[in-house]
Amino acid sequence: MDLPGNDFDSNDFDAVDLWGADGAEGWTADPIIGVGSAATPDTGPDLDNAHGQAETDTEQEIALFTVTNPPRTVSVSTLMDGRIDHVELSARVAWMSESQLASEILVIADLARQKAQSAQYAFILDRMSQQVDADEHRVALLRKTVGETWGLPSPEEAAAAEAEVFATRYSDDCPAPDDESDPW
């Protein structure tokens, strides 16, 4: 009787074998760098220093878009695609209820997302405008297309949304932050 075997028992996967004969990892897959040998990054004393500099350069290239509420209790930073990178809270949020804090974080995060996506809109529009030689009619069509096709807010729309939220959500009688004791 001929029983079906396990597909992994054959040598069909030798081309994607990431481990050497001794079982040690032979290759690494880095989403930024790609696939490379695991032995190459740490060979030589100068490469450690160069690797650290490359990480620093990469970190500096990441654009963050931050929105802080007027009372300066919540600050949200997002990446260009609108994903939240981090949220900073002032010590004064201890006086807020959980639902108030959650609501505040969501409102500020949405404004930060719009701000970041408006930068994405401006970047795409700038690159595409270069392709049409800055012809005003074509740029106007591009502006409409970028906004409608990708659903990205323009910088003007993002600024208007922030101004509207700040005007309606926060009154002028909100207490001014104490700059000496405030960590922000």
From Swiss-Prot:
Give the highest taxon in the source lineage: Bacteria
- Keyword Secreted assigned to the entry: answer is yes
- GO terms, biological process: protein secretion by the type VII secretion system
Phenotype of gene-disrupted mutants: EspD deficiency results in decreased cellular levels of EspA and EspC, but does not affect their transcription.
Outcome when changing W27R: Absence of EspD secretion
Inducing or repressing factors = Transcriptionally activated by EspR. Repressed by the MprB/MprA two-component system, by direct regulation and via EspR. Up-regulated by the PhoP/PhoR two-component system, via EspR.
Q: Where in the cell is it found?
A: Secreted
One GO cellular component term of this record is: peptidoglycan-based cell wall
Main localization of the protein? secreted
Q: Does the keyword Secreted apply?
A: yes
Region labeled Disordered — which residues?
Answer: 33-56
Q: What is the effect of changing W19R?
A: Absence of EspD secretion
Q: Which UniProt keywords apply?
A: Secreted, Virulence
Q: What does this protein do?
A: Required for ESX-1 function. Required for the maintenance of adequate cellular levels of both EspA and EspC. Facilitates EsxA secretion.
Q: How does it assemble?
A: Interacts with EccE1.
- Give the protein name, as stated in the record: ESX-1 secretion-associated protein EspD
Q: What organism is this sequence from?
A: Mycobacterium tuberculosis (strain ATCC 25618 / H37Rv)
Lineage of the organism: Bacteria, Bacillati, Actinomycetota, Actinomycetes, Mycobacteriales
